[in-house]
Amino acid sequence: MGWAGDAGCTPRPPIRPRPASERRVIIVLFLGLLLDLLAFTLLLPLLPGLLERHGREQDPLYGSWQRGVDWFASAIGMPAEKRYNSVLFGGLIGSAFSLLQFFSAPLTGAASDYLGRRPVMMLSLTGLAISYAVWATSRSFKAFLASRVIGGISKGNVNLSTAIVADLGSPPTRSQGMAVIGVAFSLAFTLGPMLGAFLSVEMVPWISLLFAISDMLFIFCFLPETLPQEKRASSVTLGFHTAAHLLSPLALLRFAAVTHSQDPPAEHRLRNLRRLGLVYFLYLFLFSGLEYTLSFLAHQRFQFSSLQQGKMFFFIGLTMATIQGTYARRISPGKEAAAVTRAMLLLVPAFLLIGWAHSLPTLGLGLMLYSFAAAVVVPGLSTMVSSYGSPGQKGTIMGILRSLGALGRALGPVVAASVYWLTGAQVCFTVCSALFLLPFLLLWKLKHPAETSKEE
């Protein structure tokens, strides 16, 4: 599996479903995503300090945002503490970033169905590199926000990575590929903040830019095209016309872009696809909200310092990476629905333990269950969705899924923070834990594509 014979940085021909080629594609995707996500996560431990610096500089744009944050904090009854303010401010910036991904993901997916995965991937990575360059070359809050906007619009590489995995021929490889993408996320969110904590605010954007450029060159040299010309969408106009259906959340939940395509799935498969999309949205809406409020709970109830919170998230990331690298990637094809259903149900006691914990062992047990479930759900759902649609629809379908996830991540933290401060931690975590039963029940009796194919 060495790369010595392919030293030149020339575009690769479309791959055929050969196991060695598929393994190589997955390795390239893993390393490329790891570089990209390390660039993104370096900032996380430094965000509170960065926001405080802009506040001290009395940046006018920062001041207007701060007034909005103060109004929202007052409306939900949040205490006027600097630490809470930083978490809320950073969460709102993160929600805006996710909202931009909600709009851009279906467009990149539809474009890649017509143009191929490689060129659209390179365009996305170029946009990400530009976003870090804008941030690195200016110290103003305006430049920081501009970099987040450019980065949010350009963050199509994750969606494209799932589409590339969906292009691969064998179901076991697709399942392993989705799990490996999850491992890249877990490792990056474990290692990136640790590395960022040792860097200065001035150095981080330059290191992120270095990672982004390295990622761009690496993908250009080693990623083959996985969507052959004969399997692509017949018209870019058709692709963008169907993608326009995704700007409405309701159309997105109906998978309207797939329904109006030239080769729509059978009605029962379309119903399954819509149900999976709803499960994905509800899961990430609830999960991202509770994940966001963990910082509030850890500080309010356990008086965790920033360092202790960093250790908590390191424990979560390490547990997730271990589960994804061992258990999740070995889930047999056709067994994803059962694994995801069990993991979804596990989140109910996990968040009940966290929300009602008054001792560190109880909190640790809740976090362990939470990490196990989180390691399984998204890769499993992604694998299931990747089984739907023709080769020329995979990018659009995975783009829809990423859009639904981005919408959930945009709305979840705002809603969960409001419930947390208006009703308290125990009510917030209890209600949200119970609500996980809704996606669980939606998924419980869903038939896997392999089963429906047998019936046909």
Swiss-Prot record:
Top-level division of the source organism's lineage: Eukaryota
A Pfam cross-reference name: MFS_1
Membrane topology (UniProt): Multi-pass membrane protein
Location relative to the cell: Nucleus inner membrane; Cell membrane
Biological process according to GO: apoptotic process; sodium-independent organic anion transport
Annotated glycan sites: 159
Parts of the chain that traverse the membrane: 25-45, 87-107, 114-136, 179-199, 203-223, 278-298, 311-328, 345-365, 366-386, 403-423, 424-444
Protein's UniProt keywords contain Transport: yes
Family of the protein in this entry: Belongs to the major facilitator superfamily.
Entry function: Probable organic anion transporter which may serve as a transporter for some non-steroidal anti-inflammatory drugs (NSAIDs) as well as other organic anions across the luminal membranes of renal proximal tubules at the final excretion step into the urine.
Protein name according to UniProt: Major facilitator superfamily domain-containing protein 10
Species the sequence originates in: Mus musculus (Mouse)
Gene transcribed to yield this protein: Mfsd10
